[in-house]
Amino acid sequence: MSFKSLLKNLPKFFFLGLIHIYRWTISPLLGSPCRFFPTCSQYALQALKHHGCIKGLGFTIKRIGKCGPWHPGGVDLVPMTTLEESLDISPATNDDDSCDSQA
C-alpha cells in the first residue's frame, strides 16, 4: 500500500479500529442479542469496507437509527454497488480485518 493510499484510507481504518474496540470491549458486556442480521457492528464493518468512510458511516448511522423497539429487526444487508458484490452476503467475523474491497 502506497503512502498516498494509506492517507486516503486513514479515516476508514480509524473507524474500523473503533468498531473492533467496541466489539472486543463493550459489546460482550451488553449481552443483549441484536435484533438484526448481520449485527450492527458487522454491518458497520461491511459498509465501511465496501463503500468507504463517508458512505459507510452514512449507512451505519441509518442502520443504528433503526435499532429500537419500534423496528422488528430481521435481515438488513449492506446495499452493494454491483451484482457481483450483492451476491456475496457473507457476514463479517471478529477476525476479519482485511480492507480489500472498496467502492
From Swiss-Prot:
InterPro entries: Membr_insert_effic_factor_YidD. One of its GO terms (cellular component) is plasma membrane. It is found in: Cell inner membrane. Its main location: membrane. It comes from the Bacteria. Transmembrane segments: none annotated. It is a peripheral membrane protein. SMART domains: Haemolytic. Could be involved in insertion of integral membrane proteins into the membrane. NCBIfam families: membrane protein insertion efficiency factor YidD (TIGR00278). This is Putative membrane protein insertion efficiency factor. It comes from Chlamydia felis (strain Fe/C-56) (Chlamydophila felis).
